[in-house]
Amino acid sequence: MIDFDILLEAYFDCRRHKRKTVGATEFEMNYMSNLVQLLDEVNSRQYKIGKSICFVVKYPRYREVFAGQFRDRILHHYIALRLEQLFESQFSDRTYNCRKGKGQLAGIRQLQRDIREVSENYTKDAHVMGIDLKGFFMSIHKPLLAKMVDGFIVENYHGDDKEDLRWLCNMVVMHHPEKDCEKKSADYLWEFLPKEKSLFTNGEDKGVAIGNLFAQLFANFLLSKLDWKINYYCKHHVRYVDDMVLVARRKETLLRLMPMIRETLASLGLRLNEKKFYFQHYSKGVRFVGAIIKRDRIYSVNNTVNNYRKSVRNLNGAAKTGNLEHIEKCTQSVNSYLGIFSHYNEYGMKRKIIKEELDKESWQYFTVKGHFQSIHLRKKFDTDIKYKNMANEVLNRKIEDRNDVPNESEISRLLDSGYELEIYATQNGRIRIEGFPPS
């Protein structure tokens, strides 16, 4: 039987950063009863996965995403809590996605160290080979993955909920969300997706839904077999999801690995994306997970720089609207890029773009902190905009709700007499209207 305390912990993990969503709010209104019901359903084998929502994202490329109901996602977190540490003991240190203490930046830094080590501090030749998998998540064979996960649990897991965990993992892996889902995107958007990139058209028992927590966890587990085989022949390599880069002194060392890599992937029902294969000297630069790694320098790829430029431009429009929520959203977008660039050698670029794209009128609203580390709304404008938004919110209410606003006939009389009116909100949220006589 599954453990209620772990299920409760999974619930708290699941709602983190999601408390304002509709599903999380509805579940939280009576969360203890809902958790007990979910517990009983799993332990009695009556649990059924609910309807998912499905949509297509257009950036950075068209991609199909499925999102399960909140109660289903709680069980995904339950699975992660029970298996993640066991999986960690099986993973290679060269796997960097969705792992504590790892991540995208850590993978980039490791690859930079590998190149420096193999080239003996850039004094010798070194070559890099980049490989990518074709339609990775959509190519995963469900029965094979379910069998591998079940075998791992049988051999390595010894908790009291072992049988329940096996049943639950098999259910989520073999689930077909495309057969019971609500589309949130227009149908024509699916026309931009190749058939092998959609669960609706890529074939029976193929593909796991991008958007569910277990997809990343189980995908790492699936590719751990390839990681260890590569590690046996080439210890200088890094993998982030399906993006891999290998480093070696001699070209032949890397090229001899290709048959083994293809054979291992074929045994997992996967294959290489031949269009994304590259092989070159390290001095030409190495592209990996959004970064260009060169000797002693790391730059962002052009797509990231262009998106940063667009986010700065959006600040101009936000400042003109005076909408605080819009301004904060645009500011957060710019700061997210500045945060990324702070780890790279990009000071000149981020400074140049802000100076080029932020117009003079907008500059009065914002201040830049540090060496272009972040941008913030000036405090005096922050307060002014809040009061302005409060006034607009009240004035846009129905007339009967505006008890604290002077009579409209009085306002009309003052205007007809040539008075200038100033409408503003006080700190306690009340609306004040002051009239200034004609000069």
Feature map (PLM): residue ranges:
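A short, charged, amphipathic alpha-helix used as a generic interaction element across diverse proteins
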Residues: 405-421
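Short linear proline/tyrosine/threonine-rich motifs used for host-factor recruitment
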Residues: 422-425, 431-435
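Short, conserved non-catalytic motifs in the polymerase core
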Residues: 17-25, 50-74, 90-102, 176, ...
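Right-hand nucleic-acid polymerase module
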Residues: 68-69, 77, 189, 194-205, ...
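Amphipathic alpha-helical blocks
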Residues: 28-51
